[in-house]
């Protein structure tokens, strides 16, 4: 694997210093990298990444941030069928499994095709009011149904 697209989290890598280190590391080893431009807020249905901006030959998307960044990126690029790997720049990550201190061995494994792709389930949830569809969205792994309204305490 040698063609990567990088999605940074501007709150966790504001100067793109960590992103730059990853790009330099990969490019020094012959890989090609493209970086998602950082914008205030994306227009339309995408929050981090417009999938149309990802080069067609991309083999892997590297998501820098945490679980939230990875979850949103998965939603944004769901129709592109490109594997994602999350690099955790925070304190604890369950989905973003690669810790920032062990990023280089993980990148080496990607470059040498020493990895397994783990398939994850994408779900679509729809909200109806009567027969009217009032909302829908997609999610990675699970959808939580909650109740909105007044908090009631029972004695």
Enumerate the predicted regions with their spans.
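Short, charged N-terminal helix-start/capping segments
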Residues: 1-5, 86-89, 95-102
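Short, glycine/serine-rich, charged loops/turns that create anion-binding
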Residues: 10-11, 89, 99, 144
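N-terminal glycine-/serine-/threonine-rich phosphate-binding loop
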Residues: 1-65, 69-79
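Gly/Ser-rich helix-loop-strand patches that form or flank binding pockets
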Residues: 72, 77-94
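Residue-level signal for pocket-adjacent positions within structured domains
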Residues: 49, 89-90, 138-140
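Glycine-rich loops and low-complexity Gly/Arg-rich segments
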Residues: 29-33, 57-60, 87-89, 109-112, ...
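Catalytic core of DAGKc-family lipid kinases
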Residues: 94-155
């Amino acid at each position: 694997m040698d063609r990567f697209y990088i999605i940074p989290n501007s709150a966790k890598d504001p100067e793109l210093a960590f992103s730059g280190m990853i790009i330099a590391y990969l490019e020094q080893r012959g890989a090609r990298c493209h970086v998602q431009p950082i914008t205030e807020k994306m227009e339309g249905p995408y929050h981090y990444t417009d999938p149309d901006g990802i080069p067609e030959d991309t083999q892997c998307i590297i998501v820098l941030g945490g679980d939230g960044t990875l979850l949103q990126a998965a939603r944004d690029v769901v129709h592109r069928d490109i594997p994602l790997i999350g690099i955790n720049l925070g304190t604890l990550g369950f989905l973003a499994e690669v810790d920032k201190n062990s990023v280089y061995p993980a990148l080496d494994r990607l470059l040498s095709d020493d990895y397994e792709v783990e398939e994850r389930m994408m779900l679509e949830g729809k909200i109806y009011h009567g027969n009217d569809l009032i909302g829908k969205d997609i999610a990675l792994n699970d959808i939580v149904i909650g109740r909105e309204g007044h908090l009631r305490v029972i004695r």
